[in-house]
A protein has these predicted regions:
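Catalytic nucleophile loop of clan PA
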Residues: 189
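Ser/Thr-glycine-rich phosphate-binding loops at phosphate-binding pockets of nucleotides
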Residues: 192, 196-197
Length: 298
């Protein structure tokens, strides 16, 4: 019986790891201390990077409204109490940016009754499969060769460059258009709430007039909210015998200026400016931008 429980535990850890390396995962921890009002955390038991993006100031002194946009990590591990918290947020829809493989491993979102779920998967450029093979190998040298000496950082820069593909742009653009026209709150998330969700939030905040440095700081705060959960995951990987050096995962677990810069440089190279990226890259016309700002800024 003990052997069966051990096997199940290892399988559970492996599922978490594989989903994690498809752009991070959430380890269930006690709610973190609430963050400052701008981009404040919504403390939950089953997700650690859930935030209302309201409170940020725009160039002209206005403020992004609270209760309109929530960014999050995966909602598959929410407790009943967590679901009740979200029920109090009057959600009009939830947008899931995860790939089907991630959903299969981590499970579907747990949502309040009646809240529509919209699947808009952002392709992970094969990262999920690649990491599955590397971690399952239990081969320290193979893991070092793939992730060490800048290998993990190279992988992440490739992920961020992929945010400019046609499929990714279509998903990001559709979500922003939904935010422009929804009367109520919208929650969007990926797995760890840091890369796809982080880039989308960065673009959204800049689109409504929040200064670039402020939008960047919001992006980087995922490191603070995720630190304890990510450390726990690395310890689980080591204890389960999958990696001798789980610190190789750190560049995959973190958000970094360099990763965001990869996407920003690419959009500037391809579109010339952030404004042109919004209109030509994401299909957000001037009328929609006006609606977006009116809906999200007060």
């Amino acid at each position: 019986m003990k052997a069966i429980r051990t096997k199940r535990s290892i399988v559970a850890v492996m599922a978490t790891v594989l989903a994690a390396l498809a752009l991070g995962a959430t380890a269930t921890l006690p709610p973190a201390v609430a963050a400052p009002s701008a981009g404040g955390q919504i403390p939950l038991q089953g997700a650690v990077n859930v935030r209302d993006i309201g409170g940020h100031r725009t160039y002209d002194g206005a403020t992004v409204k609270s209760g309109k946009v929530i960014r999050a990590d995966a909602l598959s591990g929410l407790t009943d109490a967590d679901v009740a918290v979200l029920a109090g947020r009057a959600l009009k829809s939830v947008v899931d940016l995860r790939t089907p493989g991630e959903v299969q491993f981590m499970g579907a979102d747990r949502l309040p009754a009646g809240v529509p779920l919209v699947a808009r998967p952002i392709d992970d450029t094969g990262l999920f499969t690649q990491m599955m093979q590397i971690i399952q190998s239990k081969d320290p040298q193979r893991q070092q060769d793939a992730l060490g000496n800048g290998g993990a950082e190279k992988i992440m820069n490739g992920v961020y460059a992929s945010f400019l593909t046609a499929g990714s742009r279509a998903a990001f653009g559709a979500t922003i258009r939904e935010l422009a026209s929804t009367d109520g709150a919208v929650l969007y998330h990926c797995t760890s709430g840091k890369d796809r969700t982080g880039f989308l939030t960065y673009v959204l905040l800049r689109a409504v007039g929040v200064p670039e440095q402020t939008a960047r700081q919001d992006y980087l705060r995922s490191n603070d909210f995720r630190a304890a959960a990510d450390a726990k995951l690395r310890e689980q990987v080591k204890q389960a015998g999958y990696m001798q050096n789980p610190d190789l995962l750190i560049p995959l677990q973190e958000v970094r200026d360099d990763y965001l810069d990869t996407a920003v440089r690419k959009l500037e190279q391809e579109y010339g400016s952030f404004g042109t990226f919004l209109t030509d890259g994401l299909g957000i016309d001037g009328f929609t931008l006006v609606k977006l700002r009116k809906n999200l800024v007060g």
